[in-house]
Amino acid sequence: TAFAELDRNLSDDEREEWNAIYASFSSRSLLRNTVIGLESIPIPTDDEPEQVLTCMVVMRYLVKVLIPLPLFWIEPTGINPNSVIGADVDYIIIGVDREGECAIAARSLALEQQRWHALNVQHIAEGDVVSASVMACGPTRITVTACGFDVTMGQQAMSYTYLADMREEYHAGQQLQAKVLSVGEDMLALSVRDVGT
C-alpha cells in the first residue's frame, strides 16, 4: 500500500511522531506541543468571496498539526490569536492526511477531557495549588490554562506589587503555580499571588 511505502522511508524520529499522531487519532490520547504560528486555509465554497479558516499551527518534528480556531477554545475569549504563539497546548488529533504530512486537531476536546479529570478524578477544590500554563499575556491581563479551564486574570491575581506591564514578567508558554480560589462545572478562579498563603 501507499502508506506502507511512505512509512518505510521514515527516520526513527518521524516514525515516533506519526505513531503518536495515530495513537491520538484512534484513542483520543493527548499530545502537547508549542504553538509556532497561524495559517489561513482556504475553504472551497460556491459563494464569493472565498471562505478562510484560521488555524493555530503546532509542530513537534516534521508533521504540521492544524488546530482550527473554532476548535481551540471551549468558550470564546476574544484573545488575539497571535498572542498565543509560543504557548504550550494540549490537543487531540481528529483527522490525518498522511500523504500531505499534516493533521487536524482539537484543543477543545483536550480541555474537556482535562476538565472532566480535574473535577471527577482529582476532585480539585478551593485552596489546592495547581499547575497553570500561560496562554497569552497583555499589559493588564493574562490568560492561563489549568485543569482544562482557560482562566483570565488581572494584575491583582498575579502579584502584590504593581506591574506597569505584565508582559515584562509573563509570556506565553511560561509555567506557573496557582491557588484555586473557587471551582465549578464551568468555571475556575485562580490566584498566582496567593500560592504561598
For the regions a language model picked out, list residue spans one by one.
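Single-stranded RNA-binding regions, centering on S1/OB-family and related RNA-binding modules
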Residues: 1-197
